[in-house]
A protein has these predicted regions:
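A short, conserved structural fragment
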Residues: 2-12
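Nucleotide-activated chemistry modules centered on ATP-dependent adenylation/adenylyltransferase
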Residues: 11-94, 110, 114-377
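Hydrophobic positions on the alpha1 helix immediately C-terminal to the Walker A/P-loop
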Residues: 106-107
Length: 377
């Protein structure tokens, strides 16, 4: 979409979620399933008790202290890895995956402050579906850091084949969103390939504890070899060569192509540090990197995120993002009412086929998909 139209659609959606949806809910109620009254988790994912509360909320006090704050063991591992990496590469010691969002700005600043000997190359991987606001934010934010920066945009034809295939795999997916995982795989493999070619020992990314737990299961601050496996192979049982051309295959990271020094480790420091949202915002504000009106995730999400959400609800009755965000609601990191409204709006669209945005329809067209391909009427 053109930026002006994109902004109009997002702001209209946001306005409905904030102001109008509570008034529209009674009309839409017959199309909505019950949700946990504490965290908004959908009953299709998390069965509710007689009081309308999911088991995770019933158990939250037991786990509250264990789930929050720095993990000293992981933090020590991260510190040892980053300290040892300083000066150990050829021209760079770490490829840093940069999005321009507040988490990546926070992490990059901490790396520069705490590990001044770490020679960092920032990398933005643009899959062609990034929002114009996210791209603007990244361009504006990177200018505040004295750092080398590369923006990489993979072959659009390959990207279309990849995400078209991933969307068609949604009905067979197990667990977290296969489309979102493949977006991550494209990003991580692009970074690993670059690091391997430049003999850079580390790739550093800004995944947080909740994200890692939801995507991979468990909590760890470094990718294992199993985590590196392509989800189309590991989770969907596909053979990549049957779906991608030899030219396409070069986009995927293959450990066998590289000598030992060309097998970069992938580090996730925020899993160990687990800063609060307030800490992140305070630092980003202090750096002057918080652009007023540009921080809403609806403005910065990839264009296919709403399509994933609608398709998963149509297929399973809930979507992967509800699982992640309901956990954030339980942890007090995001507000219940606003996100419950958003969840219900997506659910209504998925069940009725109504109010599907122009942006979502454009994504389908670019990927060669129909409404029926994603489960819509």
């Amino acid at each position: 979409l053109e930026q002006a139209q994109f902004l109009r659609e997002v702001r209209a959606f946001d306005f409905i979620a904030r102001r109008l949806w509570p008034l529209l809910r009674p009309v839409a109620r017959s199309h909505l399933k019950p949700r946990c009254r504490i965290c908004a988790a959908p009953s299709a994912y998390a069965p509710l008790n007689a009081d309308g509360i999911c088991n995770a909320c019933l158990q939250r006090d037991t786990h509250a202290t264990a789930d929050h704050g720095p993990d000293e063991r992981l933090a020590a591992e991260v510190h040892a890895t980053l300290s040892a990496a300083q000066g150990s590469g050829s021209d760079y010691d770490a490829v840093f995956l940069f999005s321009g969002g507040k988490d990546s700005c926070y992490l990059l600043h901490r790396l520069q402050q705490d590990y001044p000997g770490l020679r960092i190359l920032a990398l933005l991987v643009d899959n062609g579906f990034m929002s114009p606001i996210a791209l603007e934010n990244a361009a504006s934010a990177i200018a505040h850091f004295d750092i080398d920066f590369i923006a990489f945009k993979p072959d659009p034809a390959f990207v279309s084949r990849l995400f078209g295939l991933a969307f068609r795999e949604i009905p067979r997916q197990q667990g977290y969103s296969i489309v979102d995982m493949m977006d991550g795989q494209l990003t991580f493999d692009s970074a690993r390939n670059l690091a391997a070619k430049l003999e850079v020992p580390l790739v550093v990314c800004g995944l947080g504890r909740t994200q890692v737990a939801n995507i991979f299961g468990g909590v760890r601050a470094e990718f294992s070899e199993e985590d590196e496996r392509n989800p189309l192979v590991a989770r969907q049982g596909l053979v990549l060569e049957e779906h991608f051309t030899p030219g396409d295959m070069r986009h995927w990271f293959d450990r066998t192509r590289w000598p030992q020094h060309g097998k970069p480790r992938v580090l996730m420091p925020l899993v160990a540090w687990d800063p609060t949202e307030a800490d992140i915002i305070a630092m980003v504000e202090e750096l002057g990197l918080l652009r007023r009106g540009h921080g809403n995730p609806l403005l910065t999400n990839n264009a296919f995120i709403p399509v994933i959400a609608i398709s998963e609800v149509a297929n399973f009755g809930f979507n992967s993002f509800e699982v992640e965000f309901s956990r954030l609601i339980r942890e007090g990191r995001i507000p219940l009412e606003y996100w419950r409204n958003l969840f219900e709006m997506v659910e209504y669209s998925a069940r009725t086929g109504r109010f599907v945005s122009t942006g979502a329809l454009e994504v389908l067209e670019r990927l060669g998909l129909s409404r029926q391909d994603i489960g819509l009427r």
